[in-house]
Amino acid sequence: MQANQWQSVQNRTFTKWFNTKLSSRDLPSVFDLRKDLSDGILLIQLLEIIGDENLGRYNRNPRMRVHRLENVNKALEYIKSKGMPLTNIGPADIVDGNLKLILGLIWTLILRFTIADINEEGLTAKEGLLLWCQRKTANYHPEVDVQDFTRSWTNGLAFCALIHQHRPDLLDYNKLDKKNHRANMQLAFDIAQKSIGIPRLIEVEDVCDVDRPDERSIMTYVAEYFHAFSTLDKVETAARRVERFTEVLMSTHDMKIDYESRMKRLLGSIARMQEYWHTVQFENNYTDVKSHSNNFAKFKATEKREWVKEKIDLESLLGTIQTNLKTYQLRKYEPPAGLKIVDLERQWKDFLSEEANQSKLINTHMREIKESMRIAFADRANSFSKMLSTISNEITNLQGDWRDQLDHVEFLQEHLGPLEVELASVKVLYDNCFQAGIEENDYTMFSYEDLEHEFGITANIIANKIKYLENELLEREKRTLSKQELDGITKVFRHFEKKKSNMLNEVEFYAALASLGLVYDTEEGTALFHRAANSEEGVTYERFTEIVMEELEDRDSARQVLYAFCDVADGKSYVTSDDLLRSQVRPNIVKFLECNMNKHSEGLDYLTWIKQLLAEDKEIV
């Protein structure tokens, strides 16, 4: 492509880029860069849009040349103040319509404000954008081999690959006629404009089968793909976090209802049995006492065991509820008055006491029992029960992170073997008592079957707890970076580490993050760099890897959830149902949020809602 052809292509591309920025404020379009920029007004308006600053007063009706020069000079001075190099260009060049210098000026603005997310200097921006293209099209090699911003794009397949990689629902790459370059490129341009919102900055004939297309025009257009898909990835991640957070809340809500209902039922059953024991009457004969004894034994073998299991299950259920809330640093669940574990323990303690009294009442009528055998069995049974209770309490009061809890539960499981041996010894004593006709024991409330049952429950609880914790750890391990992803991060770090000091400066840090699809505005980027550098001159490889993992993984934290809602709400302080649905949050999730989230005059107040859910001693960090 000859110089005049490049200039013509750049003129069309840069004019379209210019107009996409002006259209955001419904400003008049540019038709001829040489004439329409000569009074400096549109140039100032463009800078106010892309720089998000007010340049102050300027001549809005510049009739004289000196007024036009003043306007253009104001724009150029602003550009210089932002550290952008301006070589051999002055106000007169713009006023006089020097197209070559005007195109160079616009290219400087494109580098700074469109590709500045990667770096402020063109060379690094080019390398970072090229590396992003290569990473995203790696699965389409060798048909797509992006080595530059000229010949690598002439068959249209690179554009199609970028779209298919991010939005496979819009384009079936495998059905493309790889030899029909013009049709492929036209298809990619149409989909990008109509379905993704990427402005059509270049034409098919500017790129398709051209020996060497204009590099700057293609870079400008490809940068629009970079920004569009980076935003798409961010919103999808945010929606996924919102869904997972809400699903945990919904599940926890159901568990709370289940806990309260079952707790009421268990406490009621215990109270009714206690009332029965208060009113029971004994007849002075063996048959009646034996009948009471049999009924009592039946109760212990059936209902009481169900209560023991239910009691342990309720304690475990409450622990699961608190673990779910703690995962997101939410406020601890406080059961209603009378339905707390302490209430159950108090009534259970009274129940056990009255159960013991009932047992003693029956046993007073059974004088044929040998005292020594009773004591021998009772001592071992009570000791075994205490050991089981100790293990149950250890499980109920687990603390620490997932790994610490798993290690502790596995430690408890190792003690089940000696307990099983001890249980066998208890059975020997129990069998001896049975053979001697000893059916009741005032020194213990436990039979061998009770202890065996509780031992089985405890063993099952431990096994289920281990399985639960292992699954949670496995899920968390799944969220970590794969070796391939870690290799990719290492490659990016080494690529931008220019001084080979195992450290990235601020410019290299921004470029490396952007090549991984992590883009921030100036304020966010600066804050992230200083946090990563930690008072050092730059960011080390270890800190860079940690930062990337923190930003890419789906962490369970209030801060991530808050940022997720902010992303779904497009930065607003409130989120609407349409925002949630548009981000592909499921309708049932949206309905739950509508019913439970604080109301805002224009939508749902997610910030206040999340703060209310936080534990009182927790902050969003």
Curated annotation (Swiss-Prot):
Region named Actin-binding: 86-110
GO biological process, one term: actin crosslink formation
A family per Pfam: CH
SUPFAM superfamilies hit by this protein: Calponin-homology domain, CH-domain, EF-hand, Spectrin repeat
GO molecular function: actin filament binding; actin lateral binding; protein-macromolecule adaptor activity
The Calponin-homology (CH) domain, residue ranges: 8-114, 123-230
Keywords, alphabetical: Actin-binding, Calcium, Cytoplasm, Cytoskeleton, Repeat
Domain EF-hand as annotated: residue spans: 388-419, 487-549, 550-618
Subcellular location: Cytoplasm, Cytoskeleton
Gene Ontology cellular component terms for the protein in this record: actin filament bundle; actomyosin contractile ring; cell projection; cortical actin cytoskeleton; mitotic actomyosin contractile ring
Keyword Cell membrane recorded: no
PROSITE patterns (UniProt xref): ACTININ_2, CH
Family annotation (SMART domains): CH, efhand_Ca_insen
Family: Belongs to the alpha-actinin family.
Function: Binds to actin and is involved in actin-ring formation and organization. Plays a role in cytokinesis and is involved in septation.
Protein name: Alpha-actinin-like protein 1
Organism encoding this protein: Schizosaccharomyces pombe (strain 972 / ATCC 24843)
